[in-house]
Swiss-Prot record:
The keyword Lipid metabolism applies. GO terms for biological process: defense response to insect; lipid catabolic process. The gene is LIP2. It catalyses: a triacylglycerol + H2O = a diacylglycerol + a fatty acid + H(+). This is Triacylglycerol lipase 2.
Length: 418
């Protein structure tokens, strides 16, 4: 029920029952790989030595590794590509405008760099005259550091995307703005759009943002059609894993990975192609890119973050994390129901670009259309909307046609906001 503050005990019971079933089912899955074709194969190009070294320098681009400390102590890794391969000056002959590119859920900045150089968004924008920055949110492989906590401690994972809104994005924006002295173009994909919408709605970063491009925009998830995600959300799987003491949600190893396999078996889903199962039928991926993606992703997040996303699916609203009871919510928020994020409060003069796909199982067309309706009072000359009929969720980050279909339009949009 929308606005509910209680986690029904019957639902927790269902989740625990599901987990018990999963545990009993694991022996039947031992011979199958969680992530399809990579099972048993050696990894290809990985970012073990850092994203710059593994995936930017090899293409002939300059790249800098930066560390940023959030107000709550997390040390986030960022990459900066300060210029294009040819070292050309900015398009207007002046200073290069900074662009922050923010990845989605269960991946990191490497997800933007899986194709040949001329198909990778960060490198395309650098060649177009922008100062490109890539963020890596807390919990991903190069942002698993903290001033006094470590990933083996439960407290390290005590966060949701609320903290990405309150701490991670502001730290990245402040760092970029402090070094460049310029307003920042923001580009998000999937969860990267959600935390952008939430942050801009609370007006925290609007003085530093020049424009925003949202690919596969996610805010409302009630029509999500990815079967594996829907099952996980509606059976309270994340809540149950939290109860059983697994604060880190790591799809690639341990029990979480086993549970994903068990969901596939129970629901009759062919998870050999897990990318399509989760994201929709992508039109424009090639096999080598998918293999490289699966060699590097998915990345960890917190189980609490997955609970928050599951709440968004079930409650059909965009609210802060629900602590499960009126008393606990009052303790955290001063009210029984978690505060809502009011997307319509995003400043109407902020230039926005949306691109969404007709086959996306996560950013479903109905949910995106409902999201766009929240901008009905936005300045009409500041709204730019692109619908790509045959695109699904992953096409926007590694589709072989994305440069011509989406990225060139993004670059043109950013240049118009100079």
């Amino acid at each position: 029920m929308a606005g509910s503050v209680m986690v029904p005990s019957v639902s927790i019971g269902l989740a625990l029952s599901v987990l018990i079933f999963f545990a009993l089912s694991l022996k039947t899955l031992e011979a199958r790989g969680t992530f399809g074709r990579l099972a048993g194969q050696p990894p290809q190009r990985t970012a073990a030595g850092g994203i710059c070294a593994s995936s930017v320098h090899i293409f002939g681009y300059k790249c800098e590794e930066h560390d940023v400390v959030t107000q709550d102590g997390y040390i986030l890794n960022m990459q900066r590509i300060p210029e294009g391969r040819a070292g050309a000056v900015a398009g207007d002959g002046g200073k290069r405008q900074p662009v922050l590119i923010q990845h989605g859920i269960l991946v990191d900045g490497m997800s933007w760099l899986l194709n040949p150089a001329d198909q990778n968004l960060p490198l395309i924008l650098a060649d177009q005259g922008f100062d490109v920055w890539m963020g890596n949110t807390r919990g991903t492989r190069f942002s698993r550091r903290h001033k006094y906590l470590n990933p083996s401690q439960r407290a390290f994972w005590n966060w949701t995307w609320d903290e990405l809104v309150s701490y991670d994005l502001p730290a990245m924006f402040d760092h970029i703005h402090g070094l460049t002295g310029q307003k920042i173009h923001y580009l998000g994909h999937s969860l990267g759009t959600l935390i952008g919408f939430a942050s801009f709605s609370e007006k925290g970063l609007v003085d530093q943002v020049r424009s925003a491009a949202m690919l596969s925009p996610v805010a409302y998830l009630s029509h999500m059609t990815t079967v594996i995600g829907d099952i996980a959300a509606k059976t309270f799987l994340a809540e149950a894993t939290s109860i059983l003491g697994w604060p880190e949600f790591n799809p690639k190893s341990g029990l979480v990975g086993d549970f994903i396999k068990a969901i596939c078996l129970k629901a009759g889903i062919d998870c050999y192609d897990l990318v399509s199962v989760i994201t929709g039928k992508n039109c424009c991926l090639n096999a080598s890119t998918i293999d490289l993606f699966l060699a590097n992703e998915p990345q960890s997040t917190s189980t609490k973050n997955m609970i928050h996303l599951a709440q968004t699916v079930r409650d059909k609203e965009l609210r802060k994390y629900n602590y499960g009871s009126s008393d606990r919510n009052i303790k955290h928020y001063g009210q029984a129901i978690p505060p809502a994020y009011n997307i319509s409060a995003i400043p109407h003069e902020l230039p926005l670009f949306f691109s969404y796909g007709g086959l996306d199982s996560l950013a479903d067309v109905k949910d995106v259309e409902f999201l766009l309706d929240q901008f009905k009072y936005h300045d009409i000359d500041k709204m730019n909307v692109q619908f790509v009929k045959d695109y699904a969720h992953a096409d926007f980050i590694m589709g072989v046609t994305a440069k011509d279909v989406v990225y060139n339009q993004v670059a043109t949009f950013f240049k118009r906001q100079a």
